[in-house]
UniProtKB/Swiss-Prot annotation:
It catalyses: 4-amino-5-hydroxymethyl-2-methylpyrimidine + ATP = 4-amino-2-methyl-5-(phosphooxymethyl)pyrimidine + ADP + H(+); 4-amino-2-methyl-5-(phosphooxymethyl)pyrimidine + ATP = 4-amino-2-methyl-5-(diphosphooxymethyl)pyrimidine + ADP. The gene is thiD. GO terms for molecular function: ATP binding; hydroxymethylpyrimidine kinase activity; phosphomethylpyrimidine kinase activity. It comes from the Bacteria. Keywords: ATP-binding, Kinase, Nucleotide-binding, Thiamine biosynthesis, Transferase. Signal peptide: none annotated. Pathway: Cofactor biosynthesis; thiamine diphosphate biosynthesis; 4-amino-2-methyl-5-diphosphomethylpyrimidine from 5-amino-1-(5-phospho-D-ribosyl)imidazole: step 2/3; Cofactor biosynthesis; thiamine diphosphate biosynthesis; 4-amino-2-methyl-5-diphosphomethylpyrimidine from 5-amino-1-(5-phospho-D-ribosyl)imidazole: step 3/3. GO terms for biological process: thiamine biosynthetic process; thiamine diphosphate biosynthetic process. It is an enzyme of class 2 (transferase). This is Hydroxymethylpyrimidine/phosphomethylpyrimidine kinase. Catalyzes the phosphorylation of hydroxymethylpyrimidine phosphate (HMP-P) to HMP-PP, and of HMP to HMP-P. One of its GO terms (cellular component) is cytosol.
């Protein structure tokens, strides 16, 4: 029997399954990798917004990470919601011990509803602790603005932001997602590495049901990196995956509903291919 590749997510929860650890694990499964999850925050949220956040003590996060790393090693790691500086330092300790494992950061700062998920001190700490360790960071436009301090209102500003991530912050790669731009028809993303810039375009679907798209997108990249895919291929797969998951959204809940984490699998019938 061939052992599956393992992807680890370190993030907050969503009891409705649209975002956070729950969305990551479903995305990992759809990509044919074995998912593991460490919880940083218990978040009471649904499609209508975030009601309550209970951040776990960093020692509890450490205990979970210790349980994982004392038993097995993941082939790729992603972090999502990290609400305190102490928890960032805890995660950094494990990443520094395993620098060869691909690491993806989804810098979760705002929920789709607009609710803030990270205080200003923690946002500043992110730049010095985790971003320099990342193989790829996946900010949307508002998150890229928060991190770089720029007002990103043009393609030129996107290019400037990408250079800040690579040349000043020290991330190996960053994909700045253009889904929050005002373009009515096309969603354009920009992948920056030391080698240059590559762009990805896809149709923008007219739906409000996009809860958890950032989590899902970064989770698919993580799964593909766990399988040994090059970064460009991982991002290309994630773009196809997220487009289909939005196109076939299940329309759950009374607000901004989740995407369909199994649409790619079911539509294409790629169960075997995805597990390769």
């Amino acid at each position: 029997m061939i052992k599956p590749k393992i992807a680890l997510t370190i993030a907050g929860t969503d009891p409705t399954g649209g975002a956070g650890v729950m969305a990551d694990l479903k995305s990992f499964h759809s990509c044919g990798v074995y998912g593991m999850g460490v919880v940083t925050s218990i978040v009471a949220q649904n499609t209508l917004g975030v009601q309550h956040i209970h951040n776990l003590n960093h020692q509890w996060v450490d205990e979970q990470l210790d349980s994982v790393f004392n038993d097995t090693l993941p082939h790729a790691i992603k972090t999502g919601m990290i609400a305190t500086a102490d928890t960032m330092e805890t995660i950094r300790h494990y990443l520094m011990q395993h620098e060869s494992i691909p690491y993806v950061i989804d810098p979760v700062m705002l929920a789709k509803s607009g609710d803030s998920l990270m205080d200003n001190n923690t946002k500043q700490n992110l730049q010095h602790t985790l971003l320099p360790l990342a193989d790829v960071v996946t900010p949307n436009l508002p998150e890229a603005e928060e991190i770089t301090g720029l007002t990103i209102d043009s393609e030129e500003k996107i290019m400037q932001a990408g250079r800040i991530f690579i040349n000043e912050i020290g991330s190996k790669g960053v994909i700045i997602k253009g889904g929050h731009s005002n373009d009515a028809d096309i969603a354009k993303d920009y992948l920056f590495t030391k080698e240059g810039v590559q762009t990805f375009e896809n149709e923008r679907f007219k739906t409000k049901h996009t809860h958890g798209t950032g989590c899902t997108f970064s989770a698919v990249i993580t799964a593909e990196l766990a399988k040994g895919r090059p970064l460009f291929e991982a991002v290309h797969k994630a773009k196809k995956f997220i487009s289909m998951s939005i196109q076939y959204t299940p329309e759950i809940g009374r607000g901004r509903g989740p995407v369909n984490h199994f649409a790619y699998l079911k539509k294409e019938g790629l169960d075997d291919e995805l597990s390769k």
